[in-house]
Every structure is written in C-alpha cells, then in structure tokens.
Design a protein with these regions (language model features):
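Active-site histidine-anchored catalytic micro-motif
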Residues: 101-108, 119-153
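General beta-strand structural signal in soluble alpha/beta enzymes
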Residues: 5-7, 88-95, 121-124, 158-159
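Phosphate-handling active-site elements
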Residues: 24-31, 112-122
Length: 183
C-alpha cells in the first residue's frame, strides 16, 4: 500500500498523526496509544542528542521504531548544529527535547509501523508564515531548523496561513519517512 500525505494545509505532527490514524481502526489506534504509555518515555527535558538517544535506546518498543526515532532526532540535531554553527555533540535541544515532544514523535513512529505502508509519498509542505515564540525568542516562520531541514529537498507550497504549520520535528519526520513528493 502507498500512503500519501496531504501537507498542503498543514504539516504539523497533529496533521501527520491524523492522516495516519485515518488508515487505522479505533482498536489499532488504542493499541498505539497504549504502547506509547507503556514505552517508558521520561517526562524530563533532554538537552542534547546523547540524552535523547539514551532515552530512545531504553524504550520498550520494537527496534524498527527506535531506529526511526534515532534517525528523526539525528536529522533534528544536524539541522540545529547547522543553524547554530556548532558541532553535532554541542547542539542543545529546546522544545524538541521535552518529554512530550519525544512521546509525540514515538506515537507517529508507532502509527507508521501500524499502517505499515510499502511506500510513503506526500504533497509539497505548507510551512505557514509569520512569527513564532520559542526558546530563542521571536522567530520567523519557518523556524531556522525547519528551513534547514526543508532545504535538503523537501518541496514547499505557497505559505497560506499565519501560523507555524511545519515545525522542526514535523519536518524531520517528513524527511525521514517520505520517499517521494508529488501533488
């Protein structure tokens, strides 16, 4: 089965999750949610890629899901290092390092595993426009880390909403899972 994401209106983690959930039964969604709760993601803030990877390695989930999560956070760490002009091991995670963000990323990885598509395609990505408040203060949309990830070959569409419609984490998820972009 080919899974096709429509990101023309939103490319947030919520949009990704909703589109994945539409392919699953309520029982499958409940099983994913239970797996997230049982996985053991701590609620504290993870400051760097080493802390995130240690948490991922300890999760009670299939190895494929851990591999997906490590790849997504590696994409994020490389983007942060590029934006801040520092070495990978000196990147500092702000919003993407909190426990809720890691749980949300885990949930999407588990949803992808439950859908089990042979191939994933997507439309160009809606980023939105305007400003967003984050740990670094008020920033343009897309945020620098988001823009860095999108610049690696993820096509975007004309911004059409004054909001952050693609975050660094959702851009990294898209970068990892989507194999082809088409309208």
């Amino acid at each position: 089965m080919v899974l096709h994401f429509n990101f023309t209106e939103s490319a947030t983690r919520a949009s990704i999750a909703e589109q994945l959930e539409s392919k699953l039964s309520p029982a499958q969604i409940s099983a994913v949610d239970e797996a997230v709760e049982q996985a053991g993601v701590p609620g504290y803030h993870h400051h760097d890629i080493g802390e995130v990877n240690a948490t991922i390695d300890a999760l009670n989930v299939p190895e494929r899901v851990r591999d997906d999560m490590r790849t997504i956070y590696d994409i994020l760490a490389h983007a942060e290092a590029q934006v801040h002009g520092c070495e990978l091991e000196h990147t500092h995670f702000h919003e993407v390092g909190n426990g809720a963000s890691i749980r949300n990323t885990l949930r999407i990885c588990l949803l992808v595993e439950a859908v089990n598509p042979e191939r994933i395609t997507a439309t160009p990505v809606q980023t939105g426009y305007g400003k967003v408040e984050c740990a670094h203060g008020l920033m343009d949309i897309p945020a620098p880390a988001t823009a860095a990830i999108l610049a690696t070959g993820i096509p975007t569409c004309e911004p059409s909403g004054e909001a952050e419609l693609c975050t660094p984490t959702s851009a990294a998820i898209i970068k990892h899972f989507v194999q082809e972009f088409a309208n």
